[in-house]
């Protein structure tokens, strides 16, 4: 049953990420805004989930499943690599610092919101 919950959640999270990315593709910018926003909102939600007192099945469905499928570490690093190899160093460092710096802050904010 747990595997089904996680798998269903992952599918829902991936579909949500895909749809948001499609919407965001209309924004012409070198900065990968949609991946940035997806990862920050996912960090906040995972922080909230960690601070909350939800049951283990709900936590697995939402945390491992939905948010695991929604957030995207691999796309982040792929985009960072592309920026680096295209010598867009100012965007690379801004994206890197903002994603990891704000990611930690919003995860902490989510954690405290979930208490």
Swiss-Prot record:
Q: Which GO terms describe its molecular function?
A: fluoride channel activity; metal ion binding
Organism the protein comes from = Latilactobacillus sakei subsp. sakei (strain 23K)
* Catalysis performed (reactions): fluoride(in) = fluoride(out)
Give all cystine bridges in this chain: none
Gene that specifies this protein: fluC2
Query: What this chain does, per the record?
Result: Fluoride-specific ion channel. Important for reducing fluoride concentration in the cell, thus reducing its toxicity.
- UniProt cross-references to PANTHER family, sorted A to Z: FLUORIDE EXPORT PROTEIN 1-RELATED (PTHR28259), FLUORIDE-SPECIFIC ION CHANNEL FLUC 2 (PTHR28259:SF16)
Entry annotated with the keyword Ion transport: yes
The entry's protein name is Fluoride-specific ion channel FluC 2
Where is Na(+) annotated to bind? 68, 71
């Amino acid at each position: 049953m747990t595997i089904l919950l996680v798998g269903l959640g992952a599918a829902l999270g991936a579909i949500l990420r895909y749809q948001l990315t499609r919407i965001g593709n209309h924004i012409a910018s070198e900065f990968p805004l949609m991946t940035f926003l997806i990862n920050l909102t996912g960090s906040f939600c995972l922080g909230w989930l960690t601070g909350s007192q939800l049951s283990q099945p709900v936590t697995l469905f939402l945390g491992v499943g939905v948010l695991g499928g929604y957030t995207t570490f691999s796309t982040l690093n792929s985009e960072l690599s592309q920026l680096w190899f295209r010598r867009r160093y100012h965007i690379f460092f801004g994206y890197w610092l903002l994603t990891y710096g704000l990611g930690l802050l919003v995860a902490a904010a989510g954690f405290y919101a979930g208490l």
